[in-house]
Amino acid sequence: MKVSKNELLASLKKAFEALGFQPGDYYDAADMVVWLETHGFYGFDRLLAVLTYLNTTAPVHADLMQEDTHNFVLDGKGTSVLLCGSEAVDLIRSKVMKGSCAGLELINCYNRTFIVQRLIKAAQRNLAFIAYWRQLDYCVKVSVKPGAHLPEYQTFTMLEIVDLQSLRIFCGKNL
């Protein structure tokens, strides 16, 4: 059976809306899943793994815990990046548009791989991103150059320096 990208997006938007996601949030979440799936990051498998959790918890947004000149800390309150990833990327992007560079740590969040789509989309505004997170027994580093349509995806084993459920993002005009 063949299904178009538009049909997948429409179905996922309805599914996320049924889970309690707000307009805008369910658009972004559907985009994240489809982008990962169409670019070889197994978006549907990742969604299936988290669906039970999403179905049993109310959607919550991240809280700003700390802010200084170039750094932010957001608390995801145990939610998925499908819900709080867009606001994290929008926050760091808006800070970089006003200055030179910024860093953001999103703590207490899950499904961090979904952030890749948001970083790629934001990179289309000539911004560069580097993101780090821990995934099971390894760490992931994603680099996105300004204007890039695909990330550079690397894994490494420095587990002790990356918290289990956190995501670190750095953004600038070039990194």
Short names for language-model regions:
Residues 1-17:
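Generic N-terminal amphipathic, Lys/Arg-enriched alpha-helix
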Residues 13, 25-72:
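N-terminal low-complexity or amphipathic/hydrophobic leaders
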